[in-house]
């Protein structure tokens, strides 16, 4: 029987952790990453299309292509298809009958993140400009528990997370985009990263920073402040897709995989986190594929943009690999 799984189910699974004072979790998202690249690697039809390959089709095929599916997806996401495949679970390969979908009917970012983080697919949340979220999010839920209080934080590339997570109400630090980061600034690395964010080039304008800054802010915070419930949201995948730049989109996916590896290897090497930390990795929405040119887009006008995926790895996750 084919299974249709909502990312809401992932959130419900996490809530049971609060009964165990030793358990930690990290939710990691990357915006608008298609399941097609996760489970099938580089799409050759997009990579040969001069509208999208940035005049480097040869380079893309040299770096990311193999006619063997297992090799091809491992070239793009080596950590996913080694460690997570052997030690965790991956959902969303529709070719195997594993279907992960948005529960909301809109298929863009604010509604997608809201349902993921609050377990509420409220149709009134229908705009990326929606005001502060009325629903309690999972991080807020944990921050109310005595064993997690003040050990919760979130970092995001996009400036909407202070609204999605309702920073004024939630009671934990939420650092997104060009926020004036006042947390952990006693750390020299944090000061330098913040200075680079504020003075560097802004390819995505004033609403979003490059993921490299988000990652190293979050990773520094993880190592120095030791949060027990943590969220990191990356955005380069969506930005480069909207720009129609498939080379940069693939590079962003490859880098995302490398950063997850870095996070996992760190938590498995640190006594505070080792064998007590679960990673949930997912996305907020899908993108088009029925018409290849729609890979750049999502939303209600794109009929397959509701198709998502997710992965788990952690001490209480059975090593079942790619789910069918």
Where are the language model's segments positioned?
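Bacterial Sec-dependent N-terminal signal peptides
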Residues: 1-22
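Active-site-proximal alpha/beta segments of enzymes that process anionic O-linked groups
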Residues: 22, 40, 44, 65-224
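Metal-dependent active-site segment of extracytoplasmic phospho-/sulfohydrolases and closely related
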Residues: 25-27, 35, 255-296
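Structural recognition of the beta-strand scaffold that forms the well-ordered cores
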Residues: 25-29, 36-37, 91-94, 115-117, ...
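Histidine-centered active-site microenvironments of extracellular/periplasmic hydrolases
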Residues: 41, 49, 282-313
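A short beta-strand-to-alpha-helix junction
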Residues: 71-77, 129-135, 250-254, 303-306, ...
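Substrate-binding rim/cap in mid-to-C-terminal beta-strand-loop elements of soluble/periplasmic
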Residues: 113-119, 297-324
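Active-site His/acidic residue clusters
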Residues: 168, 216-262
């Amino acid at each position: 029987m084919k299974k249709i799984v909502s990312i809401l189910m992932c959130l419900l699974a996490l809530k049971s952790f609060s009964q165990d004072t030793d358990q930690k979790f990290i939710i990691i998202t990357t915006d608008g990453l298609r399941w097609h690249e996760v489970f099938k690697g580089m799409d050759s039809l997009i990579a040969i299309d001069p509208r999208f390959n940035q005049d480097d089709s040869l380079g893309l095929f040299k770096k990311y292509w193999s006619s063997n599916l297992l090799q091809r997806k491992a070239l793009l996401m080596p950590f996913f298809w080694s460690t997570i495949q052997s030690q965790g679970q991956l959902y969303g390969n529709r070719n195997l009958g594993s279907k992960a979908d948005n529960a909301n009917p809109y298929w863009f970012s604010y509604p997608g993140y809201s349902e993921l983080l609050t377990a509420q697919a409220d149709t009134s949340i229908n705009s990326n400009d929606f005001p502060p979220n009325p629903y309690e999010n999972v991080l807020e839920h944990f921050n109310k528990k005595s064993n997690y209080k003040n050990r919760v934080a979130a970092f995001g590339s996009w400036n909407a997370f202070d609204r999605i997570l309702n920073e004024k109400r939630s009671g934990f630090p939420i650092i997104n985009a060009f926020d004036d980061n006042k947390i952990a600034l006693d750390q020299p690395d944090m000061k330098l990263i913040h200075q680079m964010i504020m003075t560097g080039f802004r390819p995505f304008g004033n609403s979003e920073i490059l993921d490299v800054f988000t990652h190293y802010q979050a990773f520094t915070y993880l190592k120095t402040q030791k949060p027990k419930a943590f969220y990191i949201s990356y955005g380069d995948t969506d930005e480069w897709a909207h720009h129609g730049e498939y080379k940069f989109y693939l590079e962003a996916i490859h880098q995302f995989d490398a950063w997850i590896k870095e996070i996992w290897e760190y938590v498995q090497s640190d006594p505070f986190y080792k064998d007590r930390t679960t990673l949930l990795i997912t996305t907020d929405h899908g993108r088009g594929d029925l018409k290849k040119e729609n890979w750049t887009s999502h939303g209600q006008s794109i009929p397959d943009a509701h198709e998502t995926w997710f992965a788990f790895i952690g001490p209480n996750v059975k090593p079942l690999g790619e789910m069918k």
